[in-house]
């Protein structure tokens, strides 16, 4: 929905408190205690002003996500409400793993983003399937299984590059990944079936 900027990271116990400027997000519609996804990670608003808000990020969240404890631009999205239009796929804000950018290069008028994902996500990453990268809903174009995890590519149109932080990515950048919700439940169902003791 908008790009914000982390401007004041502060230590908070083993975690961190972040102040994020968000002049284009429409914070007048967000209350204290409501959720905003920051680079794909669902966070709770603890304070807010007209064009900024604060979140507390626990040590657990820091260990499971990338890029939430440093200065810089972040993708922001308010929680969807019943009746809102759905574009892309449903994203919950629960990060499933951290990926590493292999490359980002321009191909004709679009861009090809290649990411190496953790091995545990391999069953949920499929050709033409959906995945969220730093909170951006995208479609997987190619998948290659490697010994260290699935390597997949995504085609990015110029508009996506303009309105998200993905254009800041480069080789070795770390990104938050959230697999498709349906794929997650299918994987869980398969695991239970293999156990033969569901009921």
Which residues does each predicted region cover?
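Conserved loop->alpha-helix
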Residues: 1-199
């Amino acid at each position: 929905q908008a790009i914000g900027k982390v401007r004041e990271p502060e230590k908070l116990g083993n975690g961190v408190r972040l102040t994020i400027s968000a002049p284009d997000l429409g914070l007048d519609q967000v209350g204290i205690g409501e959720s905003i996804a920051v680079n794909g990670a669902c966070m709770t608003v603890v304070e807010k002003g007209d064009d900024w808000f604060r979140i507390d990020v626990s040590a657990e969240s820091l260990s499971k996500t990338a890029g939430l404890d440093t200065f810089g631009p972040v993708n922001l999205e308010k929680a969807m409400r019943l009746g809102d239009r759905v574009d892309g796929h449903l994203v919950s804000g629960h990060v499933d793993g951290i990926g590493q950018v292999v490359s980002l290069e321009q191909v004709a008028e679009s861009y090809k983003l290649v990411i190496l994902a953790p091995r545990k996500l391999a069953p949920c990453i499929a050709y033409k399937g959906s995945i969220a990268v730093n909170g951006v809903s995208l479609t997987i174009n190619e998948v290659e299984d490697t010994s260290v995890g699935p390597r997949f590519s995504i085609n990015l149109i110029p508009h996506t590059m303009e309105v998200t932080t993905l254009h800041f990515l480069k080789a070795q950048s770390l990104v938050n990944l959230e697999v498709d919700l349906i794929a997650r439940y299918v994987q869980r169902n398969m695991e239970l079936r293999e156990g033969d003791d569901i009921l």
